[in-house]
Amino acid sequence: MVAAANPIAFDWRRATADDVFTLAALYRDAALRLGPLVYTPEQVRAWASFADDEPAFRHYVLHADTWIAERPGDGRMLGFCGVATEGDVREVHSLYVAPNCTRRGLGTEMLRRTLERADAEGATRFAAWVTPFSRPVFQAVGFALTQTVEAPFAGVMFERYRVERG
């Protein structure tokens, strides 16, 4: 289980089109600052480059039911989590935390709130393709590993994990 040493208080709201640019910056920052811990420089560049594809990133955020964690008072974005319905499964598309907020339970709490909202809407099955960073967070809320694959992203190979719950 992922433990929160210093839990971060946050406000929770649905993302809008006006948030896409700021979310892309948070995504890019996470990829560039955290990526080198587990990825090669080529993988880090590929991962971060997605934030620069404005139409694709906009779709990534707005196609899913994406929620934003903001610091109370000043509204600074701390992270975001998005889930979309794909058949009878709710697919978690995104879970990103600002690099200065990691290892404090924020990712786990954002994912938990996202799943609770979907549960309240009748969802019973969840799945996600996750990275080495997010896999422990998903496992902390009951997801189990079902598959490991090597898959290309922006022309670079990455190891990805399929996790499912329910």
Where do the protein language model's features map onto the residues?
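Active-site beta-strand termini and strand-to-loop segments that position acidic
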Residues: 70-72, 163-166
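Conserved G/P- and acidic residue-centered "switch" motifs that form tight phosphate/ATP-binding loops
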Residues: 105-107
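Conserved catalytic-core motifs of GNAT/GCN5-like acyltransferases
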Residues: 127-129, 144-162
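Conserved active-site tyrosine of GNAT-family acetyltransferases
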Residues: 138-139, 143
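Short active-site oxyanion
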Residues: 122-126
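Acetyl-CoA-dependent GNAT
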Residues: 3-6, 14-17, 25-100, 111-113, ...
